[in-house]
Amino acid sequence: MPINPVRRSHLIAPFGVGALSVGKDGATYITAALDYWFNEEVATDKGSEIDLHEYKVEEWRLQRLLGVDHFRLPPDYRAPGNYSHEKVNMSITIPVYRFPRWHVCPACGRLEQMPLTLKAKPKCRSCQRTYMSQVQLITMCENGHLHDFPWREWVHQDEDTQCQAQLSLSKSGASTLQYQIVSCNCGAKRSLANVMWFSTDGSSTGLSTNLNRSPKEYLCSGSSPWFGRHQPEGACGLPVRAALTNATNVYYPDTKSAIYLPRRSDIAPSELVELMETSPLDDLIRDSSKSDAQRLRLHHPLILKPFTDEQIEAALKIVSNKNRKMESAVDQIVDYENFEGDLLPLEYEQLKCKQDEPQLQVQLIAIESIDEKLRSYFSTISLVKKLRETRALVGFSRVYPGSSLSLEQKKKMMFNEAPTKGESWLPAIIVHGEGIFLEFDQDKLESWESYQAIEKRVKKLVERHKVMERTRKWLHKSLSARFLMIHTFAHILINELTFECGYSAASLRERLYVSNLGGKRLSGVLIYTASGDSEGTLGGLVAMGRPGYLEPIIWKALEKAKWCSADPVCMEIGSGGGQGPESCNLAACHNCCLVPETSCQEGNRFLDRALLIGDPVSGADIGFFK
C-alpha cells in the first residue's frame, strides 16, 4: 500500500480502527484492526524490529476503568534513510485495506471487484488504458459492520443469485441515484432508486426491504473488512442501509479521556510510587500475595535505600490497591453513567485545590478578587497552568453516534484476537495543555433550579431525548436544567475566548463536571486546550482567566447570547420545539451557541441559551445570570 501521512492523534479520531480515509493517490482505505498495528510481519519492512516499550503509556485511572494493562501511542513513521544507524522501530506503518472493493471504469462503466490488498490503481480490462476508480456506495448496519454494496444481488433482485456475468454502471440523465442504472450482460437491469431510504426508527431500510424480489429481507452478514481475510464468524441479522463513503455517519469514534492526577499520600513520595510501577519491584509486588518493606528491601536494597520503611509501606499500599482494581476491571462491562461517576469526581476535587506537580499545576484565584457582580455566581475559579490528558479509542459506531454495545463487545470490534493476559491495550494519545476551571455556586444553582418555569422548559427536551434513547438504543443519560445551563455557558465562553486568547475554537475543548452521584453534586466546567506539545502551550488561555481579564470575557459572552442573528426564530424554536441534532437543542444554533464537534463532548446537543439570559419570547425570567 502507498504511505499516506496522517497525524498520530487522528488515528484515535477521526481515522481510527474501521474508519475510511482518502489517501494521497485518491483511493479510499479502511484502517486495519489493532492486531496488525504493531505486527512485525505486517507493519514494518523486513529486518526491522519493534520495541513496544517506547509506545507504552500509563494512565492509572483510565486503565482501571477500561480494563487494560496499558495504552499504546500510535507509531510514528521513521524513514530508514534518516536513521541509518537505527534498526529498532523503523518504517512502522499502520496497515490499511483498499475499501470499497468494487471499482468502476469512468469511460465504459465496467464494474469489477478487487481484493482488499490491491496496491495500485487497476486498469479497466475493457478499455485497457483507463484507470478504474472505487464506487462511492457502501452498506452498513447499526452494529458497526461494513459491506460492499451488493451490486450483483441488487440487479438480479436475489441475494442468492448464481449469475457471474459482467456488470456495468451507467447514468441516464441527472446524477441522482434514480438515474444510475446497474446492468448485467445476462440482460438484467435496475436503477438505484430508493436504496438509501430508511424508516425513522431504523427498523427497515430500502436496501433490506427491496433487494429481493421475494418478501425475504436482505440482512447484515457481519462483514468487517478492517480484519482483512480473518473475518469474524456469524451473521449480524440487522437491516443494512446504503451510504456514501464520505458520509459523516459512516464512522463515529468512541473516545474516553482522563486528566492526569498524581497518585500520592502525605507520606509516600510520588517518585517512589512511580518507581514501584516501572521497576522490577512491580513484578515482585504482583507475584507476591504478601509484600512488606523488609521483603522488598531484601530483593532490591539499592533501589530502596533512599526511602524509609514508612514511606515504602505507604507507597506499597497505593500500588497494591491500584493493581487489585486493575485486576477486577479486566472483565468489567462499563456502564458509562458509572464511568463518568468514577472518573470525574476525583478530577473535580483536585482542580479545586492548589497543585504543583510536573504534569498538573493548578493555581487558585481568590474569589474576592473577582468583580463583585460576577463572584456571586461562582465558588471556585482555578487556573490550570499545566495538565496532561490521556485520550483513548474505546470503540466506534456507525449510523448513529453512541452505542449500546458493552466495553468487551467494542473491543472485539477492534481486535480479531484478544491480547494475551497481562498485555491488553488500547490506542491512546497524550495531550499537554492548559485550562480554566470554574465551579458554580451551589446555593445559587439550587435556588435557580427551583423555578417551575425552568423545570417545565427542560422537561420537553428530556422527554424528546428519552424517545431517542429508546429508538436508537442509546445509553441512558441524566439531563437537568443545571447540565443544560453549564453546558451552554461552556460553549459561549469557548466562542468568546477565541477572540481573546489566540486559540481557534477547534483548539479548545470542554470537560463538564455536572452530576448528582453518591450525594455529591458536581457543577463545574474545565475549558482547556485540546492540543499541545510535550511542554504544553504558551499560556494564552490561563492569562485570560486572571482577575480583570475573565470578567469582561464572561460579560461579553453573555451579552452576545442575548441576541442571535437567527432570532426571533432561534428563540421561538426553543420555546416551542427543538432544533439541532435529533432536535436535542432548544434556543441554540450555529449562529449563537454551537462549537466545532471536536470541542464538544456531547456532539453539540443539550444546549439552551435561554437558561443563561432568559426567554424574551415568553417573557419567562429563567436566566441564571439575571
Annotate each language-model stretch with its function.
Residues M1-V155, Q166-G173, Q178, N212-K626:
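Extended, well-ordered protein cores
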Residues Q128-Y131, A188-V195:
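Short Cys/His-rich micro-motifs in 6-15 aa windows
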Residues D158-C163, S204:
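Short, surface-exposed linear segments at secondary-structure transitions and domain or protein termini
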Residues V182-C186:
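C-terminal interaction appendages of subunits in large macromolecular complexes
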Residues K189, M196-F198, P225, C236:
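Extended acidic/polar, glycine-enriched regions
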Residues T200-D201, A530:
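Short loop/turn motifs enriched for small/polar and acidic residues
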Residues S203-L207, T248:
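Nucleic-acid endo/exonuclease domains
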